[in-house]
Amino acid sequence: MSTAVRPDEVSSILRKQLAGFESEADVYDVGTVLQVGDGIARIYGLSKVAAGELLEFPHNVMGMALNLEEDNVGAVLFGESNAVKEGDTVKRTNILASIPVGEAMLGRVINPLGEPIDGKGPINTDIRLPLERRAPGVIFRKSVHEPLQTGLKAIDAMIPIGRGQRELIIGDRQTGKTAVALDTIINQKGKGVQCIYVAIGLKGSTVAQVVNTLEKYGAMEYTTVVSATASDPAPLQFIAPFAGATIGEFFRDTGRHALVVYDDLSKQAVAYRQLSLLLRRPPGREAYPGDVFYLHSRLLERAAKITDDIEVAKKMNDLPEPLKPLVKGGGSLTALPVIETQAGDVSAYIPTNVISITDGQIFLESNLFNAGQRPAINVGISVSRVGGAAQIKAMKKVAGTLRLDLAQFRELEAFSKFGSDLDKSTKAQLDRGARLVEILKQGQYIPMPVEKQVAIIFIGTQGLLDSVDLKQVRRFEEEFLAMLEQKHPEILSSIAEKGTLESDIASKLKELGEKYVASFKEKSKA
């Protein structure tokens, strides 16, 4: 006998079924590829897409929306554009381009999307921050006042860099720009500064060499390398510096110190020019787009020294949600952008732009490099606009006369080429200048602690080296500093701890210098 279903049962079954029904359907905003080529895709649809939003193409290729036009969207592809074809479906991801950050990034080599490329497995970090972010406002900053020692005598004495500063390294190819940046990274060992090295458009072999150098000197443990090599697509070279800045900002906003090296921004500008022309943006001077200045200014303005007041720091503009509970005051992000000039032309478009954005520049010259002066810094036209406030008192004291002596030496040297009969005082000045130039020479990857720099520059500016043979100056420096370290460590530790050159220490140093010069000359004769 069949049992009849009662109407009230039917209604209760229907109610149960309806209660479990999800009324919301997943709505995907999708578009269609109209045209693709040269790493650029034109997409129809995606009417609600945001500028800088990540897009998902077939075959796991990611892209980013850059041009939002009336009837289509211009996007750049972060992978092989051969995998994408006309008519393909493109999905919005609803997330702006971002990168993982945190301590787990240290010691790793990544691409600009935050994916590891060093074969050491995945990176375990939960925090992701957007690539593009507004720089901190004036209220949240503090003036630069702590030194960032590079370990290079010529820079720390005459072109000092402070934490939170932007100092440009500029010069022709093969003048030692990368070497200056790497020396600075190696010198941060044990100083609590996290470093980020961004390689833009360099050869893959060069990046591998940089990583090997950093590993050899134990610097990789506090360094992240962001690599967009010459073989990577232009969009990756364009976003690489922003990825480096974002990793550095995590340390800056959590009350720590970070140093980011962009090597080099001229290649980023070329990649951006390529993208802009392919997106049919109007070209300007040297065919660069009109906003190439803004490209570099918005990047370099993110380097800052943050206020010590934690309550003010917590209200920082554009602070991403994951960072809010971690914010501390007093952090800094220092930027060392690198620009390559063509035949020493610093008045070209990109060099003048970046010179005007940064707080000073270090000029490296090929003729000085070829003459054996390394680092090949032209002290006359190199400048640090804010670093003076960050220099330790001891260095300020000895370096003031150094800059003046060198300037006079350069002037006299130019005149002395014309005349052979020089008076005694001119000859003495030329001799001292030549020895000071010799002191400032330094080997690669052997940064010097600031207290040793102060000691040897003091000996040079006091004229104690005037009687030492020019060819023996480097040997004298090595032996004198080794003697100080072994027999008189209290002198070096006093300079290091107090940051000043006390009068009693100065007179003791001078006395030791005079004695050592005499014994050194005796030894040399023998």
UniProtKB/Swiss-Prot annotation:
Alphabetized PROSITE patterns for the sequence: ATPASE_ALPHA_BETA
GO MF term list: ADP binding; ATP binding; proton-transporting ATP synthase activity, rotational mechanism
Positions bearing the site annotation: Required for activity: S382
Keyword annotations: ATP synthesis, ATP-binding, Cell inner membrane, Cell membrane, CF(1), Hydrogen ion transport, Ion transport, Membrane, Nucleotide-binding, Translocase, Transport
Highest taxon, organism lineage: Bacteria
Compartments where located: Cell inner membrane
E.C. number: 7.1.2.2
Membrane topology type: Peripheral membrane protein
Binding site for ATP: G171, D172, R173, Q174, T175, G176, K177, T178
InterPro entries: ATP_synth_asu-like_sf (IPR023366), ATP_synth_asu_C (IPR000793), ATP_synth_asu_C_sf (IPR038376), ATP_synth_F1_a_nt-bd_dom (IPR033732), ATP_synth_F1_asu (IPR005294), ATPase_a/bsu_AS (IPR020003), ATPase_F1/V1/A1_a/bsu_N (IPR004100), ATPase_F1/V1/A1_a/bsu_N_sf (IPR036121)
Pfam families xref list: ATP-synt_ab (PF00006), ATP-synt_ab_C (PF00306), ATP-synt_ab_N (PF02874)
Assigned GO CC terms: plasma membrane; proton-transporting ATP synthase complex
Gene3D superfamilies: 2.40.30.20, ATP synthase alpha/beta chain, C-terminal domain, P-loop containing nucleotide triphosphate hydrolases
Quaternary organization: F-type ATPases have 2 components, CF(1) - the catalytic core - and CF(0) - the membrane proton channel. CF(1) has five subunits: alpha(3), beta(3), gamma(1), delta(1), epsilon(1). CF(0) has four main subunits: a(1), b(1), b'(1) and c(9-12).
Family listed: Belongs to the ATPase alpha/beta chains family.
PANTHER family: ATP SYNTHASE SUBUNIT ALPHA, MITOCHONDRIAL
Function: Produces ATP from ADP in the presence of a proton gradient across the membrane. The alpha chain is a regulatory subunit.
Name the UniProt record assigns to this protein: ATP synthase subunit alpha
Name of the gene: atpA
